[in-house]
Design a protein with these regions (language model features):
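Small/polar/charged residue-enriched interaction surfaces, especially the RNA/DNA-contacting tracks
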Residues: 1-190
């Protein structure tokens, strides 16, 4: 299934790293330096949306989350059940091929996909807290695409369950609760 992420605001799918004294956080990039959402983060977004669909909204059958995304071993259980594997494979969400071809050999266009944002923590007295200034790289709003593929054990309704979960994914990456990474997720056929 082809899935599109239409980013509506600046966003960062972080790498967990920075660049010495210049940037505290970096955007994930592909081998050509273009922004992406790693497949692992895509999976996490869908996992949380399906959890909400099943547990909070009760619009998916009980057990759907484990059926699609598998389970982990429970170290607190003296007689643990073996973990169940996931039945879906998630790829990195990248710029569409037509866009990548136009941009990849033009360093000025690649650089234009990113900006640096500054932030600081404000104390109760309305003044910036000491040593709280941060510089983070963000990507400009773009549309990314990814493939989600079923494995042999996937139930027949996996795609319809993920389509129902798509509207529940409202933001991606870091800063989601602060307005960054607002997104519309849709089936690629739309």
């Amino acid at each position: 299934m082809l899935v599109r992420f239409r980013l509506l605001s600046f966003w960062r799918a972080g790498t967990g790293g920075g660049v010495s004294a210049t940037l505290d956080s970096l955007c994930a990039r592909d081998i050509n330096g273009l922004p992406l959402i790693p497949g692992r983060q895509v999976k996490g977004l869908f996992r949380e949306a399906v959890r909400e669909l099943e547990e909070d909204l009760r619009r998916a059958p009980p057990g759907t989350l484990v059926q699609l995304f598998g389970s982990r071993a429970d170290p607190d259980n003296p007689l643990p059940d073996p973990p169940l594997p996931a039945v879906l494979r998630f790829s990195d969400a990248r710029l569409p091929e037509a866009d990548r071809v136009q941009i990849v050999d033009r360093p000025e266009l690649v650089a234009g996909l990113f900006q640096t944002r500054r932030s600081t923590a404000i104390g109760p007295n309305g003044v910036a807290k000491p040593h709280s200034l941060r510089f983070g790289e963000v990507a400009v709003p773009v549309t990314l695409a990814t493939e989600i593929d079923p494995l042999a054990d996937a139930p027949g309704n996996w795609a319809s369950l993920l389509r129902m979960a798509m509207p529940l994914i409202r933001a991606v990456g870091s800063g989601r609760t602060k307005g960054q990474g607002r997104v519309i997720v849709s089936d690629g056929t739309v």
